[in-house]
Amino acid sequence: MAQASQWIGKPIKRVEDARLLTGRGAFIDDHPPVANARHAAIVRSPHAHARILGYDVAATLAMPGVVGVITGEDVAKACKPFGVGVTAPIHYYPSATDRARFVGEPVAVVVARDRYIAEDAADHLVVRYEPLPAVVDPEKALEPDAPILHEAVGTNLAGHRRLVYGDPDGAFAEAEVVIRERFRFPKYGSTPIETYGVIARWDGLDGVLTIWSNFMGPFIMHPLVSRVLGVPENKLRFIVPPDIGGSFGIKSSIYPYLALIGLAAMKTGVPVKWIEDRREHLTASSSGTDRVAWREVAARKDGTILGMRFKWFDNVGGYIRSPEPGCSFRPTGNFVGPYRFKNLEVDASIVMTNKSLTGPNRGYACGHLYFETEGMMDRLAEKLGLDPAEVRRRNLIAPDELPYRTPTGGYYDSGDYPKTLQMALDMARYDELRRAQKTARAAGKYFGIGLALAVDPSVSNMGYVATALDPQFRAKPEYLPKSGATESATVKVDPLGRVIAI
């Protein structure tokens, strides 16, 4: 068993509070004015699914102070689609091109002298739509008569993986008790104090595009934005401000706007600034994936779990956008949580619907996993007439088993799960709660007690990327190497001698 840490479980004094509380933070909107910068407003689709028939930009361009308009037609001509980690031919651009596939999808950008003019001018821009049938449920999206979002794909199934560890069929054949349950995990969002922000400046003489943005983890997406805009990596500069006003994972999905505002700067020839407003953020920034899942548990009558089967349908919205399908696979190493069962089958479907796009958000994928697993632990306890805490205790990895290798490849280096559970029960006065629950229920009152155990991945070293990607993508340089270290550097030299340092 590994030595206890001198840091874990200890109060650590915060060092940033004084600077932030006295107004000395430096966020994207505080960036020193870029000379001759103009402001952008984004026109968004009011339809969940609609074919774009055309644009009328004359009234917008005629307004005083308007510098230019970028439409989906311009995006289609000037940009390549973003790379995605599946083989399905899904063409995801910085804005809608042929059709809009979710409410709030960008369809045009208006650049003007200030944000007020840009917003007013955007109201005068006319987009002609042909509304189409929409589908928002991931199971219904796979039915034969469901509207197809991407005709080139021919289905709304963006990807599918089946992973088998150990001998799940043998575990279920041996089981004395089998339980099956359906779960629905809702789409969810977070609201950081600071919304998205992008400032882009194009230097036509040197061919250098500089982008300032409150992007969480910009280096991962640098090659993708470079490819989309056709700007060499060594000519594309990403600069992150000293402070970011919250993210919860959401700001890792800002990169389509880096490309869109970058294109606006390149097309108009002036620096362009865009700060997302709260309505835009709530409508179309990035949300957590909603899921429909089926779980099966094979167990003995004493509560010992022999194996599980996972089957889920993850709803990624109108397109699959990197780092999706990470929601299905980020917790791969800890699929079994703190429990010692060795047999597992995972059947994961990634489905496109006419909802807004998804990405990292508040624990990215882990909430789904814990909700389902812990729900099954409670149902097993109820089936067997055992206390929910006791069922969990009987299946925990013991301290003397650590370090422990999970069947899915995770490595648990240290911990004492039984002790941690007991500490939580003692602090909550669990036995007293159960007695109070019994009394309340005898009186006809509701009295619930919830338990949940989790082993949460922190630095994953990006190992789940190899699981999420189709095999032909796994060794490509834009995806690998990756480092899970808090600090790392990668230097690439291409055949022409151009150096890219990340």
Please identify what each model-predicted range represents:
Residues K235-P242, G269-R279, L306-K311, F341, ...:
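Beta-strand segments within the central parallel beta-sheet cores of soluble alpha/beta enzyme folds
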Residues G197-D203, G207-L209, F215, L224, ...:
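Non-catalytic terminal/interface segments that mediate subunit docking, oligomerization
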Residues C79-V84, A121-H124, T191, S213, ...:
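Short acidic, glycine/serine/threonine-rich loops at helix termini
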Residues E16-T22, G85-V86, T155-V198, D290-G375, ...:
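Glycine-rich loop/linker segments at domain edges
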Residues I42-G72, A108-R128, V198-T268, P325-N334, ...:
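Alpha-helical support elements that line or immediately flank enzyme active sites
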Residues M1-G159, V178, Y257:
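Flexible, low-hydrophobicity surface segments
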Residues V67-K80, H160, Y411-R441, G448, ...:
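Amphipathic alpha-helical
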Residues A88-A112, Y116-I117, F248-K301, T358-K383, ...:
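Glycine-rich and small/hydrophobic secondary-structure elements
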